[in-house]
Regions:
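Extended alpha-helical interaction segments
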Residues: 1-117, 168-171, 176-179
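A sequence-level detector of short, solvent-exposed, charge-rich linear segments
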Residues: 57, 64, 114, 148, ...
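Conserved, folded interaction/cargo-binding domains in eukaryotic regulatory proteins
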Residues: 118-164
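Eukaryote-biased recognition of C-terminal alpha-helical segments
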Residues: 154-188
Length: 188
């Protein structure tokens, strides 16, 4: 069993700046703010995970997990209507692809001012994306923290994760149970 990683290194951005950066600016539409930030967090997570793809293979990570007690099954509304066990890289690819498809879908993420966001935007679309992206962070922490450290990406990882968690908590996008794989780590 893998040893828990050491305490996080200093962040690249001070915590008070991260806390300020997640607050909805006065006069900003909440859905626009959620959409813009989800796109940014998707890109951050994708970049971090992308640096680990040589270490995260179907052989090294035959299931999508975050430690010994958290295995995740994939389901979606098109290909996998029943939950299915995928390797971590397959799960993460499906997850990132589904978020990218949603980001590109005008009916979900409208780019024209006159077009409204769907009624279930925050409660379903954004919340599900956040829950699943957190699983990627948890997988990286549990399964690939050594590789992150060897690549010199620890500060990037912790800054990205903390920003993500602060935003998720600010808007109620992550629940206490979502943090279970990183219990005690995300207490910000």
């Amino acid at each position: 069993m893998q040893q828990p990683p050491p305490p996080p290194p200093p962040l690249l951005v001070p915590v008070h700046v991260l806390r300020q950066s997640v607050v909805l600016p006065t006069g900003e539409d909440a859905n626009e703010w959620l959409a813009a930030n989800l796109a940014d967090f998707y890109n951050h997570c994708n970049l971090l995970y992308g640096s680990l793809t040589q270490f995260c293979t179907p052989e090294t990570c035959p299931t999508m997990s975050a430690g010994p007690h958290f295995d995740y099954l994939w389901t979606d509304s098109t290909l996998f209507k029943k939950p299915i066990r995928l390797s971590a890289p397959e799960y993460i690819d499906a997850l990132l692809t589904s978020i990218q498809m949603a980001l590109d879908d005008e009916s979900v993420f409208p780019t024209k001012p006159a077009r409204p966001f769907p009624k279930n935007f925050q409660g379903t679309v954004v919340k599900q994306a956040f829950k699943r992206l957190f699983r990627v962070y948890a997988h990286m922490w549990h399964a690939h923290y050594g590789a992150l450290a060897a690549l010199g990406e620890e500060a990037h990882f912790w800054t990205s994760l903390r920003h993500f968690v602060l935003f998720g908590k600010e808007f109620g996008l992550l629940e206490k149970k979502d943090f279970a794989p990183m219990e005690g780590v995300c207490e910000w």
